[in-house]
Structures are given as structure tokens and as C-alpha cells.
Amino acid sequence: MAGTQDPSSLEEILWRSPSHVQMMGGYLHSNNILFYFAESPFFDATSNNASLAIQANYNEAFRHFVETREAFEARLKTMQGLEFMVAYDPLQAAAGANAQFVHEPSNVWVIRKQTRRKRSGFEDEVVVLATFFVVGDCIYMAPSAASVIGNRILSAVTSLTSLLKTASTLPKFTPSHGHTYLPPAPKSTDVSHPSVQSQTSKENTPMPDADATNKSQSFTGSQNSSGPAVYDMRSLAESFSLVARYGDEFMDESPLMGEPGSFILSRPGDADRGAAPKQSQPSSTNAGGRVGTPLAKVDTPGKLSDKNSAAEEPKLRKKKSKPAS
């Protein structure tokens, strides 16, 4: 029988002993499973199982307690302290199963390490300390819930730590895109759309021969694709519609007036004001001048003096007529 060991180290070991299985009849069953478990390092020599087995070896009155597992466990239930009990017997489970449910019998034994405390007038208080599995001739210790959760949390924290270390070097900052994990991809230009204009540098300017080749290729490509033709027809129809709707309107605040060569900037209300007087004035036709051309008025010095003298004569006549009245 093995002594006590650290429970944390027992979770990481597997124990098996084919020689003990051969000594116990070649296979494990309900009456020898606890004695096979007593040879493993998971067994505690200070338990009630060990003390009862020692008493049976030296006292014939206790011999019948070790002959069957039912008698052995019944004796353990009358004692108080640390004990090992079979919690699941695959042979009994297979024998007590429903005959209509056909299944293969399991070969997994479940043994519990527990403490029993007697209470007068009440049922015994049993506290489970550990659980063990016997699969074939291999014995395992079931991990505790705390160790399982701790290992899962440790695994998650380790993965997150490595992720944060990797992700801390990925972000890049640009004024146009801000913080990004991937470099910004250049925007793809759609050549088929008429509003998209390709901007080429002087270094990429093709030679004359290459230019002619590119033009021929683009011409053949435009004939094969119906997309540009549809956009061209739509643009042409929209242009005709705009001309028919707004062809007579001007966006200039001060429209030009006059003829070519003598345009004059006018205020918006000048055209309306000058329309009525021009209609009332009779149209004068001069044989010497061209139609629509303004005539320049030139006065000679001799004619100017005659006009002035003719204007002064009526004034003198009016002055003379006043005394007579």
C-alpha cells in the first residue's frame, strides 16, 4: 500500500500494474477492485480501508468482511473517518439494465475518496475529497473543478497576452484614414464611367506609336463593350433636354449690350427702361449711313457761329417788344 502524496502531482500521473491483475485472477471485478486500487499511489494508508484489511489478515472474525465488496463497504459505513468507496460498478449497471436496451457493458470504475462523520439521530455526513477512474487496469485521478477552471483561464489569458503583443505592432496612423490595422488600399478607378478621368504623369506619356496602338485598342474595346455607349447616349439626351429647357436664359447679372466691337455692360433694368422710348421715336433713315450704325455728329466752326447768331435774334426781338406794351 502506498503512502500519501501531493494531490496536485497525482492529477498528472497514470498508474497500472498488470502483475497485480494476474495475482488477482487475471481480471478486475467487484470483489478485488478496491484491493487493486490499494496498491496504487492514490491510496491512503491511514484510511479505514487499510485498517480493516490489516485486521482481517490477523483476525479470523474479520475475514468475512474482505470476501465480498458488499460486506467490506457495509463494515466501512459503520466506521468514522477517511474511506474509499466504489461509486459506480459497471458490472452491476450492466446486470441491472433494461433487457430491451441493448448496449455494451462499460469498463470504467469510479472510486471516491471521502470522509464520514457520525451524527446521532441523523444520517452520516459524507464529504467527497477526490474522485478516481479505473479504465481497464489504468487508474486516473479526476481533476478538481478549481484546477480545470484555473487551467482554462490560464490558457485564455496566455492566448490574449500573445494576441495583444502581436496586435500592438499592427496599428498604423494616417491623417486621411486614422488608426488602421491594414494599410489602406488604393481606390480602383472605373475606366468605363465617363466622369472618371485617369491622371497620368509626364513619365508615363506614351510615344506616338504606342499612342496610336492604345487608341486603336481603346476603340476596339469600346465597340465590344456596350457600357460607354449607353453613358454617351444618356449624356447626349440630357444635354438636348437642358438646351431645350434653358437655352434662352442667361446667367450673367449684367448682360452685354451693343454690337460686336462696341459691347457695353448694362444694369439689369436698363434694357426694360430703354425699350419704351425707343419704340416711340420715329425711325430715321439716312441715305449716306448704314442701317443700324450710329452717326457721329460733327460741328464746323462756321456753322456753330450761325446757330449762335440765329439764337440771339429772337432774344433781342423779345426785349424790344416789352416797352411797347
UniProtKB/Swiss-Prot annotation:
GO cellular component: core mediator complex; mediator complex
Domain of life: Eukaryota
Compositional bias ranges of the Basic residues kind: 316-325
Gene3D superfamilies xref list: Mediator complex, subunit Med6
A family per Pfam: Med6
Main location: nucleus
Biased segments, Basic and acidic residues type: 304-315
Annotated PANTHER family: MED-6-RELATED
Family according to the record: Belongs to the Mediator complex subunit 6 family.
Protein name: Mediator of RNA polymerase II transcription subunit 6
